[in-house]
């Protein structure tokens, strides 16, 4: 029975000295995980799959940013990484060597999010300066998209080959869809009652999920530019990730990670590690998520600087 699947905590990856703010994987390198942190670095991990109780080993630390790294992503060909930082810049890195190959300078505030087109031609970034910027790969700003009236917390380019859509989310409580061809607004998605901190696009680019302060996840149909339905996370949401091969959505909330089954619009599982009980300490929270390319593992970055690895299992009846 496929519906009996649950997620089991399999291991941890330790190497960062600050909150793990972002995670990225790529089908081009199934044994690779990239993480970004408040410690100003990125770490490239080689995933070992649990041999010797180790789920992965840090292979390289990418240094160069002078402030918190807020977001990381990997190019579709698996050759490059991109990072967004509170130092107001983006960096393009050679994923193999860990060297910076390009800096992107122009934002007037912390850069909070970055995304690269599948064809590798365009890069978009979102900032506390309330703008989305569109760049080419040699670091030239091609356009500045204005329209949000508060911090732009997240931006994603559609993964679909046929699409030139960019989705952005803001603390102004709106999600916007932009056309990269002429930099116009396709649609404004209204519905959140608090700031939005994260968005994720489905693997085929047809769906967007957004969430944040109000504890409600809204699913949007990007083909028809309309609201589909909502899911109740019942807690502030820090991160979202669609499974690459199941109709699931993972949400990192202040009260644990929730896995929703989208077909049934129901909660499949809730992931809460056992933390040592502290007198005053809050439990660490998951603030970043990424599924492995095969959908069998969920990686979560936490505020105790640790990455936890959950595996999809079918309990033997």
Curated annotation (Swiss-Prot):
WD repeat residues: 15-55, 64-103, 106-146, 148-188, 191-230, 232-272, 281-317
Molecular function GO labels: G-protein alpha-subunit binding; GDP-dissociation inhibitor activity; protein kinase C binding; protein-membrane adaptor activity; ribosome binding; signaling receptor activator activity; structural constituent of ribosome; translation regulator activity
Record localization: Cytoplasm
GO process terms (BP): cell adhesion; cellular response to neutral pH; cellular response to starvation; filamentous growth; filamentous growth of a population of unicellular organisms in response to biotic stimulus; filamentous growth of a population of unicellular organisms in response to neutral pH; filamentous growth of a population of unicellular organisms in response to starvation; G protein-coupled receptor signaling pathway
Keywords: Cytoplasm, Repeat, Ribonucleoprotein, Ribosomal protein, WD repeat
Recorded superkingdom: Eukaryota
Main localization of the protein described in the UniProt heading: cytoplasm
Protein task: Component of the ribosome, a large ribonucleoprotein complex responsible for the synthesis of proteins in the cell. The small ribosomal subunit (SSU) binds messenger RNAs (mRNAs) and translates the encoded message by selecting cognate aminoacyl-transfer RNA (tRNA) molecules. The large subunit (LSU) contains the ribosomal catalytic site termed the peptidyl transferase center (PTC), which catalyzes the formation of peptide bonds, thereby polymerizing the amino acids delivered by tRNAs into a polypeptide chain.
Family as reported in the entry's similarity comment: Belongs to the WD repeat G protein beta family. Ribosomal protein RACK1 subfamily.
Assembly description: Component of the small ribosomal subunit. Mature ribosomes consist of a small (40S) and a large (60S) subunit. The 40S subunit contains about 32 different proteins and 1 molecule of RNA (18S). The 60S subunit contains 45 different proteins and 3 molecules of RNA (25S, 5.8S and 5S).
Protein name, UniProt field: Small ribosomal subunit protein RACK1
Name of the encoding gene: ASC1
């Amino acid at each position: 029975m496929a519906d009996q699947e649950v997620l089991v905590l399999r291991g941890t990856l330790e190497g960062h000295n600050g909150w793990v703010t972002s995670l990225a994987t790529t089908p081009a390198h199934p044994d690779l995980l990239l993480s970004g942190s408040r410690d100003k670095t990125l770490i490239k991990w080689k995933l070992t799959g649990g041999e010797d109780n180790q789920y992965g080993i840090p292979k390289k630390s990418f240094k160069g940013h002078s402030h918190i790294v807020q977001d990381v992503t990997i190019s579709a060909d698996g050759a490059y990484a991109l990072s967004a930082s509170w130092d107001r810049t983006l960096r393009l890195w050679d994923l193999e060597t860990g060297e910076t190959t390009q800096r992107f300078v122009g934002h007037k505030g912390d850069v909070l999010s970055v995304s690269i087109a599948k064809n590798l031609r365009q890069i978009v970034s979102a900032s506390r300066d309330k703008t989305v910027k569109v760049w080419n790969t040699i670091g030239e700003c091609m356009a500045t998209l204005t329209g949000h009236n508060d911090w732009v917390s997240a931006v994603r380019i559609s993964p679909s080959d046929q699409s030139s859509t960019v989705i952005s989310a803001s603390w102004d409580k709106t999600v916007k869809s932009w056309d990269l061809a002429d930099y116009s607004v396709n649609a404004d998605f209204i519905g959140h009652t608090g700031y939005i901190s994260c968005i994720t696009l489905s693997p085929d680019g047809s769906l967007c999920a957004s969430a944040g302060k109000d504890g409600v996840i809204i699913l949007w149909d990007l083909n028809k530019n309309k609201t589909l339905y909502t899911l109740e996370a019942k807690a502030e949401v820090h991160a979202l990730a669609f499974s690459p091969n199941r109709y699931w959505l993972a949400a990192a909330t202040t009260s644990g990670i929730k896995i929703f089954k989208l077909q049934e619009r129901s909660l499949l599982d809730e992931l809460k590690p056992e933390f040592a009980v502290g007198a005053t300490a809050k439990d660490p929270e998951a603030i970043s998520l990424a599924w492995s390319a095969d959908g069998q593992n969920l990686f979560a970055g936490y505020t105790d600087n640790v990455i936890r690895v959950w595996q999809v299992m079918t309990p033997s009846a």
